[in-house]
């Protein structure tokens, strides 16, 4: 939204997170990506859980991946920390910790305020289907970092 003076209205962090929570609870697209609060008692809305169902025609097909997203006090000005809880082998994910490397994952590397947790999860799903990730040998299903 733009005002007549040329300045933009900045939606406060908590309102933004409430919007994201509502969208995440309603479901996204084809249902292969979802997210919600990790702890309903967290009044600062910092800890979130995401789920991605692996894309078709890849080694990830049919697998369910759980992720943790942490939105610090400076979100959405800065991106959340994203970590796979489920073990996965991807070029942008640290093999020891499951943390998504912001330098190797475009959405985090080029973060903009209007990006959302939904954008992160949908782009991670697309990254799973990318030629450099779609056939990588994966850890056994059901294993965690």
Swiss-Prot record:
InterPro entries recorded: UBQ-conjugat_E2_core, UBQ-conjugating_enzyme/RWD
GO CC annotation, single: UBC13-MMS2 complex
Coiled coil: none
Organism domain of life: Eukaryota
GO biological process per UniProt: positive regulation of protein polyubiquitination; postreplication repair
Positions of the UBC core domain: 12-145
CDD domains per UniProt: UEV_UBE2V (cd23807)
Protein role: Has no ubiquitin ligase activity on its own. The heterodimer with UBC catalyzes the synthesis of non-canonical poly-ubiquitin chains that are linked through 'Lys-63'. This type of poly-ubiquitination does not lead to protein degradation by the proteasome. Mediates transcriptional activation of target genes. May play a role in the control of progress through the cell cycle and differentiation. May play a role in the error-free DNA repair pathway and contributes to the survival of cells after DNA damage.
Name of the protein this chain belongs to: Ubiquitin-conjugating enzyme E2 variant 1C
């Amino acid at each position: 939204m733009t005002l007549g003076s040329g300045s933009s209205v900045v939606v406060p962090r908590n309102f933004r997170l409430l919007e994201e929570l509502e969208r995440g609870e309603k479901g996204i697209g084809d249902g292969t990506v979802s997210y919600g609060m990790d702890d309903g008692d967290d009044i600062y809305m910092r800890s979130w859980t995401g789920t991605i169902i692996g894309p078709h025609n890849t080694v990830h097909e049919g697998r369910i991946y759980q992720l943790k997203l942490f939105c610090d006090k400076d979100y959405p000005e800065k991106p959340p920390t994203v970590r796979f809880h489920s073990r996965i082998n991807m070029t942008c994910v640290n093999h020891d910790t499951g943390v998504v490397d912001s330098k190797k994952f475009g959405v985090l590397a080029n973060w903009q305020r209007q990006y959302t947790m939904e954008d992160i999860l949908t782009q991670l799903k697309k990254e799973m289907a990318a030629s450099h990730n779609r056939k990588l040998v994966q850890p056994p299903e059901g294993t965690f970092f």
